[in-house]
Amino acid sequence: MSKASKLKKQAELAQKPTVKQAFFNFVDAMTDNRNFCMAWLIAGFIFFTIYGFIDNPDLAKTASVIGKTHPRLFIWWAVFSGVSLYLNIHYLYKLNSFKTEKLAKFGNVCTCLGFFCIFACVHIPSVEPEDGKPLQMAAHWATALLFAAFFAAAIIAFLLYKSMQKSVKHIIMLVTLALTLILMVVLLLIFGKSGGIESIPMWVAYIIIFMLNYTKPFQPVKD
């Protein structure tokens, strides 16, 4: 092989995207489609809500406990919840050209970590203290809490950025989300884990994201 051919081959390999680059290019293309992202958000909200009531009319059981008897549905719960939030947070950032700021970079990292944690959570079955598996129990609850914390942090990063620009409507959203998270922690400390308490911040997050992405008052003003 001639030197010119080697250089040409090296140039072609350099231009070929890595698996990581190909994945992010795919996500970037998907988040160009407003209707696609909206459909996922609505589907995620519906599936999350229906799943929470399976054998659980009083919402006493958490998603993890339901997953013990319905493991396949638990995986689908992760798919619908994880993908709908991941796509729509990326859509939110792109819609508002929220890319280069430090908070945007922080939010993007949190979104990826939240996506990873929700799938890690469903692959570590929930156990109780009496089962004698403390490490598994700790790993399951750690990934469950981190999934919620990372996705919440990604939304808060955007709302905080807008609030720093003195946008009243975004400040209201930020305060609403913050109070919801505080309320959840207080209720968990008082009543212990519960499907109803677990669902409240997810429902609020879905509603906030829908308003930010798809309602007229929150659409960015075009120059």
What are these model-predicted stretches?
Residues 103-118, 171-182:
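Transmembrane alpha-helical segments of multi-pass membrane proteins
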